[in-house]
Amino acid sequence: MARLTVEECMGRTNNKFKLVILASQRAHDLNSGASPVVKHKNSKNTIIALTEIANEQLDVHLLFNLAVQRCRKYMEKFINSDDSYVVHKSKDNIDIFQKNATSNFDELGANSLNVENSKFLDGDNFFLTQKE
C-alpha cells in the first residue's frame, strides 16, 4: 500500500525528496495531535500523511511552509545556543556546517524568519499542481 501511495503522491511534487519533507511535516502534525482528514484503520501516521497528500486533501504549500518554520526554529536554537561544544570550540576548529549556518543566519537577519518573504528552497517548479 505504501508504494502505491508514494507513486500517487509524485503527482503533487516534482521529486521524492520534497515529498519526504511534506510527509514528515504532516506526520509530525499528526503525532502532535492534528486530526487526520482521511479515514484510516490502524494505519501509521506516515501512511496517513502520504494518503492525505495523494488524495489532494492538504495544501502542500502551507505544509511546506510549516516544515520550513520548524526547521528555522531548530536552527535558531542551535545558533543561539549556549552549548559548551559551540562556545568553547576554537575558531580554527569550527566545522563547515556551523560556520556556514552562523554566517548565513547573521547575513539574513531577523526578517528571514518570515516564510512568505524568504527564498528558502524556492523555485519556479518546486511544486507541480494537477490542474486539468
UniProtKB/Swiss-Prot annotation:
Catalytically driven reaction(s): RNA(n) + a ribonucleoside 5'-triphosphate = RNA(n+1) + diphosphate
Pfam families: RNA_pol_Rpb6
SMART domains, alphabetized: RNA_pol_Rpb6 (SM01409)
Enzyme Commission number, as recorded: 2.7.7.6
UniProt entry keywords in alphabetical sequence: DNA-directed RNA polymerase, Nucleotidyltransferase, Transcription, Transferase
A Gene Ontology molecular function term of the record: DNA binding
Any one GO BP annotation for this protein: DNA-templated transcription
InterPro entries: DNA-dir_RNA_pol_omega, Pol_omega/Rpo6/RPB6, RPB6/omega-like_sf
Role description: Promotes RNA polymerase assembly. Latches the N- and C-terminal regions of the beta' subunit thereby facilitating its interaction with the beta and alpha subunits.
HAMAP family (UniProt xref): RNApol_bact_RpoZ
Family to which this protein belongs: Belongs to the RNA polymerase subunit omega family.
Name recorded for this polypeptide: DNA-directed RNA polymerase subunit omega
Lineage of the species this protein comes from: Bacteria, Pseudomonadati, Pseudomonadota, Alphaproteobacteria, Rickettsiales
GN (gene name): rpoZ
